[in-house]
Amino acid sequence: MPDKKQFPISYISHCLSPRAMFASRAQFTWWQNLLIIVFLNALIMIPVTLHYANMTTYPLERIVTKSLSPITDKTYQALTQGKIEKDTFQGQSLIRRDGELVLAVLPTKVDLEQLASESTRQIIVTKKEWRFVTPDGKELRAHVRGQQQSLADLTTVKAVKDFVNQQWYDSNKASVLGFLLLTFVLMVCVGTLIVIGLGAFFLTLTKRSRLFMIRNFSEGLGLMVNCLAWPSLLAIALSFFIQDPVLIMNCQVFGTLLMLTWVFYKTQFRD
């Protein structure tokens, strides 16, 4: 039998074949199994973190729906008349409306009070910051960034939206990175814990049958963790090319279930 002192190196040898996975189901304690789960998911996060850290932009509207919708054919020219110098927006004070959408450029104090009383979707740019306001009054802010840039070069709605989106991203890159990583971690870890926990629970139920040799929850947990190894390696490889947490989670979940099926086919859950 494998020596517990070899942990965590011995985990690799436990996963080389279905029979080894089943035979070593009781070799690790619960905290060692938990550590293995955390370690495998942490490995997945390495290429994902590198990808997110090297991103040059990210769509604001994936975080706040319709946040750039105030920039329309009727409003965008309020921005293009301005310029940015030394992180300061300069230009005329203009407010343009398109139905329930408002684009306010360098509004006065009176204008800001009026806008605050409205239930409209707004983009407000002051000398030093951008404000993205939802109809219910929630705000997302970003600093004005740039040393010397004329916005007159932005001749289409898409170009203006891309520019404003980049202003937001440059100001909030660290927060965006943290948000994306947290979302990825939660989805992948929740998927892993659900399949491992439920799998161990249902395997424990087999102890009532004399046909199988899984005696308790700990052994069921150990077997599920052993089955997690190869799907996690595949998920790590995929994460170098794909940063979709749902796909990565499904790779681990269904891969683990397939490995468990393979173990059952080879061992019938008997030593």
Curated annotation (Swiss-Prot):
Listed InterPro entries: Maltodextrose_util_MalA (IPR016546)
Superkingdom as given in the UniProt entry: Bacteria
Role according to the record: Has a role in maltotetraose utilization.
Protein name, entry field: Maltodextrose utilization protein MalA
Taxonomic lineage from the root: Bacteria, Bacillati, Bacillota, Bacilli, Lactobacillales
Encoding gene (name): malA
